[in-house]
Amino acid sequence: MPGVRWVRIVGVACAALSALALSVTSASATSRIKDLANIEGVRQNQLIGYGLVVGLNGTGDTLNNIPFTKQSLQAMLERMGVNIRGATIRTGNVAAVMVTGNLPAFATQGTRMDVTVSALGDAKNLQGGTLLVTPLLGADGNVYAVAQGSLAISGFQAEGEAAKIVRGVPTVGRIANGAIIEREIEFALNRLPNVRLALRNADFTTAKRIAAAVNDYLGVKTAEPIDPSTVQLSIPPEFKGNVVAFLTEIEQLQVDPDLAAKIVIDERSGIIVMGRDVRVATVAVAQGNLTVTISESPQVSQPNPLSRGRTVVAPRSSVSVTEDGRKLALVKDGVSLQQLVDGLNGLGIGPRDMISILQAIKAAGAIEADIEVM
């Protein structure tokens, strides 16, 4: 219908936003200690380096626009015995890049690690490029690894005179096993008098259960919870000098972790994730939609032939209001997550309204869980 305008007014007793999906998570009955905690001090270390990628098919940096690429190229050639100071360099096959990687815990000299290569200048594509020898430094400024190799690019770019297609990110690549570790980080595990376990999700109950499981297994009080994220293990005399064997037995013990009631909401993607212990107190929920339709049908009045009249347009509008019939539902005290979801679905509420309704129930003080909005 010409000239029709739609105005949609949504009245939601609790609230209404959008949600694209609703996910329900439930933790398994038990988990291994190695899945719940890390050994304190045992972690990866970030490495970074600056280098050059060569062999690009004209898709590298524009040397006149990116001075650091030109300076790096000149310095590299001078180390090779080629002096080009003052000469005009015209090449599009070189790109300045940053190289990053994670040094694994207990990595030894000669082992390899993956690295990621990212363009630093205005290079369009790193496809087909080769990273030249690049030292990788730690936060202390020492060189821990050296990277070199051919890049693997997941994205691509193709262009013509009047069109261009880009898929993925062609200016970021990866070299599998592209760096050789040259320096080790010393960590005397077998000399430690005690070991601390760092829980991935801090919780008083879980920390206490881990300590109890270890003490029950060994038959002596060896483990002690320090805080909700730390459990300290004293090395028994029979495992002195052999901490690896001690941890091998401990990390396989099964523990029932306790989870805090939490609802995680990602408003960008519309995803809702709820824990198993989410409970709701007594609350009434209603949701209704009001649709107002405004139709414009202008009428044209034409004068008689050979008359001195004028063509006149007379506006004509019609307004109609439609309200969806929705019920008021009472959610009783102590209902479970499944009952809450079933109740909301019974109201005819789709996933698009779930996020705001949950936020409104929380604002009313009727939901026993933390809501984290990402």
UniProtKB/Swiss-Prot annotation:
GO terms for molecular function: structural molecule activity. One of its GO terms (cellular component) is bacterial-type flagellum basal body, distal rod, P ring. Keywords: Bacterial flagellum, Periplasm, Signal. The keyword Signal applies. It is found in: Periplasm; Bacterial flagellum basal body. It comes from the Bacteria. Residues 1-29 form the signal peptide. InterPro entries: Flag_FlgI. One of its GO terms (biological process) is bacterial-type flagellum-dependent cell motility. HAMAP family: FlgI (MF_00416). Assembles around the rod to form the L-ring and probably protects the motor/basal body from shearing forces during rotation. Belongs to the FlgI family. The basal body constitutes a major portion of the flagellar organelle and consists of four rings (L,P,S, and M) mounted on a central rod. This is Flagellar P-ring protein 1.
